[in-house]
């Protein structure tokens, strides 16, 4: 492993995924250094979640490679996955388990010391404000409570790379603020965050770099100020609209409004 590769946490090279006649991700190449929070944006169906699934070993690419901390996830899946923490867009929990039982299982899968795993789990659940529910099955949990358990599971083994797909989904404002500050702290410690979201205001504030995907291809890559200069937009929201919109937004809004009201002014 050369010096440059030691500084790169994520290396995607010509990553491609085809589903029958549809190319969901087309030759995506991307290098993310250690300690960076990289926002990965795109419209619905752009290929963001498919990219994350390939990068984390949950989906086999049609072609191309994903390397995590120097380990090709296709050739060395155990070594690569041991370094990854994932919060998926639609995370599935074993809801018949309690949070304590679920996190104990996650700790076992990562070969953590049982006492250490239990102590960390207890701390996470307490900090997330759900310690009083730690011994209740998760069948009746709200979306936000489940999300807190998923985030705890992703952090439990102290991963060097975090893949987060809409991580703030369902979280209350205070917890979302804590998580955003935590991500900055982890990045300052050298961890890498691959952050997928549609909440552009958060991405603009949190991410060091923004990559925009459309129709399975990278169409922009830079920090927020560079992307604003590129499009002469005032915000990341404006950048995103300029680069990915298929029509004039005001015309689209007007058409929706007329459809809702039947063309009648209120």
Whereabouts are the PLM-identified features?
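Conserved ABC ATPase "signature" region
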Residues: 104, 108, 115-133
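Catalytic Walker B motif of ABC-type/P-loop ATPase nucleotide-binding domains
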Residues: 162-166
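A short, surface-exposed alpha-helical micro-motif characterized by mixed small hydrophobic
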Residues: 203-204
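ABC ATPase "signature
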Residues: 221-222
């Amino acid at each position: 492993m050369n010096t440059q590769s030691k500084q790169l946490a994520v290396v995607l090279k010509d990553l491609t995924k085809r589903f029958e006649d549809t190319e969901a991700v087309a030759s995506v190449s991307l290098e993310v250094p250690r300690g960076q929070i990289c926002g990965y944006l795109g419209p619905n169906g752009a290929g963001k979640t498919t990219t994350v699934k390939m990068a984390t070993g949950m989906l086999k690419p049609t072609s191309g490679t994903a390397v995590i901390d120097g380990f090709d996830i296709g050739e060395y899946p155990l070594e690569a996955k041991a370094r990854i923490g994932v919060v998926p867009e639609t995370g599935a929990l074993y809801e018949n388990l309690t949070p304590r039982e679920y996190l104990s299982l996650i700790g076992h899968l990562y070969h953590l010391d049982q006492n250490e795993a239990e102590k960390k789990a207890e701390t996470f659940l307490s900090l997330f404000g759900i310690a009083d529910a730690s011994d209740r099955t998760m069948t009746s949990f709200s979306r936000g409570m489940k999300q807190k358990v998923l985030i705890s599971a992703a952090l439990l083994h102290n991963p060097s790379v975090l893949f987060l797909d809409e991580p703030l989904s369902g979280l209350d404002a205070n917890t979302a603020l804590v998580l955003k500050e935590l991500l900055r702290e982890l990045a300052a410690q050298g961890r890498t965050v691959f952050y997928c979201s549609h909440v552009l205001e958060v991405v603009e504030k949190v991410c060091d770099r923004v990559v925009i995907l459309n129709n399975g291809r990278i169409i922009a890559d830079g920090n927020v100020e560079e992307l604003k200069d590129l499009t002469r937009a005032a915000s990341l929201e404006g950048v995103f609209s300029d680069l990915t919109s298929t029509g004039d937004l005001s015309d689209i809004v007007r058409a929706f409004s007329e459809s809702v009201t039947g063309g009648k002014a209120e």
